[in-house]
Amino acid sequence: MTYKPISWININSKKQIEIHEWPYKKIVHAVAGISNPGNFFSSLRSLGFEVVEHIFPDHYNFSKNDFENLLDLPVIMTEKDAIKCEVLDDHFWYLKIEAQISEGMEQK
């Protein structure tokens, strides 16, 4: 199974934009509190982003203090992490993805 990037969703406003319509520079803070953050960071890099990695433990409970020093660039996180965050500034986004079943798995 692979994951296909679908769109960007603003965490504060819930505004959704197409994956190719990113409105900012392509250097971002990437925040991940998941078990394998490398895949998330690789996905962003494959979309042409320069990534400043911020790794948190899996199932981390974020607070606004965790983001105090992330004001200079847009912040992208996983949908799983975004759901756990309080209202954040408008420069916080998450990457919406869709699972793609590989051809071999479909036939099983």
Predicted region positions:
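C-terminal accessory "lid"/substrate-recognition subdomains
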Residues: 1-76
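Short, flexible loop segments at boundaries between secondary-structure elements
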Residues: 4-8, 57-61, 91-108
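Short conserved micro-motifs at the rims of enzyme active sites and ligand-binding pockets
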Residues: 43, 87, 105-106
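Short secondary-structure boundary segments
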Residues: 78-80
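Short acidic, S/G/P-rich loop/turn micro-motifs used as interaction or catalytic elements
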Residues: 82-83, 101
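Short loop/helix-cap segments at secondary-structure boundaries that form the rim of catalytic
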Residues: 83-91
